[in-house]
Amino acid sequence: MKILMVGSGAREHAIAKALNKTADVYTYMGRKNPGLARISKNYTVNDESNFNEIIKFAQENNVELAFIGPEAPLEMGIVDELEKEGIHSVGPTKSAAQIETNKAFMRKLFEDYDIPGSIKYGTFYDLDEAYEFIDNFDEPVVVKPIGLTGGKGVKIVGDQLADNDEAKEYVKEIFHQKMGGFEGVVIEELLLGEEYTIQAFVDGTHLIPMPAAQDHPHAFVGNKGPITGGMGSYSDKNHLLPFLTQEDYDKSVEIMEKTIKAIAKEQEPYKGILYGQFMLCKDGPKVIEYNARFGDPESMNVLSVIDDDLAKISKQIVDGTLDSVNFLNKSSVCKYVVPDKYPNTHVADTVVDVDEDKINELGAQVFYAAVYQDMDDSIKLTSSRALGVLAVKDSIKEAEKICEEAIKYVKGEVYHRNDVATEELLNEKIKHMEEVRL
């Protein structure tokens, strides 16, 4: 089978690697990702928003279906355009992708269809009304731009914001900058608990969940600093998490199933990957937000333990015949290596040296993200996350240890969170959840 891969990050590298076990991958990427280039039967480097070029590349290589990695092309309607040319995609249409690309749409969907896991919130297109909501709410809030911001637009009182007065200042900034493409904002209650992710394959009707994972979005050790796209993640061999019970997992999946039914009624059938970001609270799972594609880094966790044919699954998704998917009973840990002082880095265009042979000898893998391969084949940093180092073992503890050893073979002006998935941090999360449940 010939499959078109759209995207140029570590998520796409992980997807392509899984597809490549049984299919030929043809990659359309915005910059030359060395891992993707190596895997691909053919590739081109071009603007990921140029749909005419994407379609031309797909047709020249006679691909049978497409797998869309990032959210931006989904928001712009790449799936709709490919469908017009007879190329089916693993990825939702523009209207169905609103579950991620429009936070106001997502919250209203929960309200209209009485989906469990909803929270107190308000959507505002008037600045004074937003201020009034915050003043009357009288509790710490979370402020979100309505549209896409690359995972970096959410700010929380008690974290990035000192108090609700600062929240109002941030609301003003969102309005004036039209952050996320909207002159509007979603304001939500601040939830207390532990965040986690469940991703699922969806064929329009059937939803098959993957192992749960937990991301670490804060830039610095100890869950400090600004929110990033994710500094690392882990999954456990029982497909749960140390603080997440089977009942919690099942309730989360039920919420996702009700969501895809609601999307089908409101817009059209949802096909592709659905990523649910949840908060486990005292009274059960609550939905923080959805993504219309694999998470980054969580894609690396689940795709590294999939014990099935991703190309076959992709075909079943577009055909509406999704059946079952098998996963190994293994634990995984992924840690992101990023430029020094990320996300406010000044070391872009410097060389990062990656000894993949040594990393592979240790039993770890590398997934390249926002790096580019220069004319002399050197790998250079950009201002974003550089690469994910992932290990799969029988326990989180073993996988974390391998990850740390492997990262020693990445040299350059780089940094990583060495506390991701450590026993100490996991125990903190277990203790925190026990306190929340009291």
From Swiss-Prot:
Reaction(s) catalysed (UniProt annotation): 5-phospho-beta-D-ribosylamine + glycine + ATP = N(1)-(5-phospho-beta-D-ribosyl)glycinamide + ADP + phosphate + H(+)
Please name the GO terms that the record assigns under molecular function.
ATP binding; metal ion binding; phosphoribosylamine-glycine ligase activity
Cofactor(s) needed: Mg(2+); Mn(2+)
Q: What is its EC number?
A: 6.3.4.13
Sites binding Mg(2+) 1 sit at: 277, 289
Recorded superkingdom = Archaea
**All residue ranges annotated as the ATP-grasp domain in the record:** 107-319
Q: Which SUPFAM superfamilies match?
A: Glutathione synthetase ATP-binding domain-like, PreATP-grasp domain, Rudiment single hybrid motif
Q: Where does Mg(2+) 2 bind?
A: 289, 291
Per its UniProt record, what InterPro entries does this chain match? ATP-grasp, ATP_grasp_subdomain_1, PreATP-grasp_dom_sf, PRibGlycinamid_synth_ATP-grasp, PRibGlycinamide_synth, PRibGlycinamide_synth_C-dom, PRibGlycinamide_synth_C_sf, PRibGlycinamide_synth_CS
Is Ligase a UniProt keyword of this protein? yes
GO BP annotations of the record are:
'de novo' IMP biosynthetic process; purine nucleobase biosynthetic process
Cofactor: binding details: Binds 2 magnesium or manganese ions per subunit.
What does the similarity note say? Belongs to the GARS family.
- Alphabetized PANTHER family for the sequence: PHOSPHORIBOSYLAMINE--GLYCINE LIGASE, PHOSPHORIBOSYLAMINE--GLYCINE LIGASE, CHLOROPLASTIC
Designated name of the protein:
Phosphoribosylamine--glycine ligase
Q: Which organism is it from?
A: Methanosphaera stadtmanae (strain ATCC 43021 / DSM 3091 / JCM 11832 / MCB-3)
